[in-house]
Every structure is written in C-alpha cells, then in structure tokens.
Amino acid sequence: MRCSLRGCVQGRGGKSGVSLSKFSPKKMSFFFIFMVIFCIQSLVALLQNGFLATVLGREWVRSQGLPAGDMIVACLAASRFCLHGVAIVNNFLTFVKLWSQKIYFSVLWDFVNTVNFWCTTWLAIFYCVKISSFSHPIFFWIKWRISRSVPRLLLGSLVIGGLSAVSSATGNTIAFQMTACENYTLAYRTRAFYAYYFRCHAMLMWIIPFFLFLLSVILLMFSLYRHLEHMRYRRPWSHDYSTQAHTMALKSLAFFLVFYTSYVLFLVISVTRVVNVHSSWHWAWEVITYMGILLHSTILTLSNPKMRKALKIKFPDLCVARSQDKRRG
C-alpha cells in the first residue's frame, strides 16, 4: 500500500506474495476477518467522502463558487475518496500477487496521498488563520490573503502530488528492472537501496505538511482555550451558547488532531516494515491505519453546516429520532 515497490521487489526477488498455505487455521481466520473489516471500513469511507464531495461539488457548480473553507473540504473529500479506492485495489493486487499491475496503482496512491496530506494541511492553516485571535502583523497579513490564495494552494497540492508520483515511478521502474534479472545479490542490494530511497521520499512528502498541520492545529487550540478562559473569567457562572460552542470546538479539534496523527504515525511506522505484505497481521494493520483517516473525515462531515443540512434532508427520520433522544435525555 504505502511502500510502492516493497511487495513487488519481494515478489520478483524470490519470495511469493501472500501465501495462505503457511498460515495456521487460527491465523487464517484472523486474516480473513480483518480483510472483511477492511472492506467494510473502506466502503463506509467511500460513501462518506463521496457524499461530502458530491454535496459540496454540486453547490460549487450551482453557485459558480464556494467559500474558501468549503473549497478545501471538497477537494480533501475527493482526494480521500480516491485514496480509499486505490488502497482497496492495491491491497487486493498484493493478495493475488499481481505485482506489475500493483506498481501503477502504487504510484497513483503516492499521488493521491500526497494531495490528501497537503489539502489537510491547507484546511488546518485556513481555520487557524481565520479563527485564531493572534495580533502579530504577519498573522493579519496571512488572514487578509488566505481566502484568495486557496485556489492556488490547491493547485500547488496537485503539482506536489505530481512530483511525488514522478519520483515514485522513477524509483519503481529502476528497482523493478534491476530485480528482474537472476542476480539475487543485485536484487538484495536493490531492495536495500529502494528501502532507503522510499523512506527518504516518504519523510519528505509526509513530514513537512504534517508539521505544518500540527503547528496550525496546536496554535488554533491554544487561541480557543485562551479565549475560553477569558470568557470564563469575565462570566464565571455563565454557561452561555458561546462558551459551549468554544468547548465543542476544542473537543472537535482534539479528536481532529488525534485521528489524523494516528494515520500519519501508522504510515511512518509502516515504512520501517514492521508488518509486511506476507504477514497475517497485514489486513489488521491496514484497518488500524485507515481507521484514523475515516474518523477524521467523520468529524469533517459532522462539523460542516452544509453537510448537516444535507444529512437532515437525506435522512430525516434518523435526525428526528436523534432529536427525540436528546429531549428525553
């Protein structure tokens, strides 16, 4: 999934793909249970992000434009829809040992995942700049320009994703051709070189946007917390709507941070090949990795006013039942 040629090099270098014959019955049942969970999880993610992208995309076409924040969310949802789709294809190509076909989808995964990273980063920066109450002149300058810069930032994400895909495709092609020969010493050295190459590639493409995301979310949480404490100091016995809204925003940001960070950490750990494609834990690892980004998208969906309105229209009975439960509570 993440390491584009990791399984492919192993497959051409003398090892087979995921062989079920080596698993005990207990491990085999474990293997298939998590495979089914991964498929269900991916289907939920596809429906969720597809719904989010469709609603905002339709609004974009209808009104000939979107607010800058919704524009980023629409592009982020589209990239995650593609990411989950490509991840499903990649994993099943690995399962049936179609290594040469997997290379092309792995390059596509690199492109989509890089775009996803940068769109998430732009969203965090946008909300940080728009909502935070810092008084530094540079902050005011960014706040004044950020909305007009969003289309260019999104275009930049596509360019960076394209560069990532070119880099990945180049490394894949060289390594795959070198391992096609019968020289196993060369194949081993090629795997070692590619592992080092891909780790550097992944760290460059993932860590930079994640650091900006982390910084933006922490600054925003600090600003909201400071403002909340100021309101509580001025009105210590008041629990008005504004205080509740700030508290809910802080909780949402905390979950936002935890879920997305878990996705990034599992990706980074996977580069070290803690769990490879031949392991019975492979599907369990995939479930855990993509769970973070699925929950992250859920928060985006539920915190967006347009999405809440669309959900009420699409599922009125569910919303009525939920409101009745709240009244009873």
From Swiss-Prot:
Several bitter taste receptors are expressed in a single taste receptor cell. The chain crosses the membrane at residues 28-48, 69-89, 122-142, 154-174, 202-222, 252-272, 283-303. Residues 1-27, 90-121, 175-201, 273-282 are extracellular. It is found in: Membrane. Belongs to the G-protein coupled receptor T2R family. It holds the Pfam family TAS2R. One of its GO terms (biological process) is detection of chemical stimulus involved in sensory perception of bitter taste. Putative taste receptor which may play a role in the perception of bitterness. Keywords: G-protein coupled receptor, Glycoprotein, Membrane, Receptor, Sensory transduction, Taste, Transducer, Transmembrane, Transmembrane helix. The lineage of its organism: Eukaryota, Metazoa, Chordata, Craniata, Vertebrata. CDD domains: 7tm_TAS2R16 (cd15017). InterPro entries: TAS2R. Residues 49-68, 143-153, 223-251, 304-329 are cytoplasmic. Expressed in tongue and gastrointestinal tract. GO terms for cellular component: membrane. The gene is Tas2r134. Glycans are attached at N183. It is a multi-pass membrane protein. This is Taste receptor type 2 member 134. Its main location: membrane. One of its GO terms (molecular function) is G protein-coupled receptor activity. Gene3D superfamilies: Rhodopsin 7-helix transmembrane proteins (1.20.1070.10).
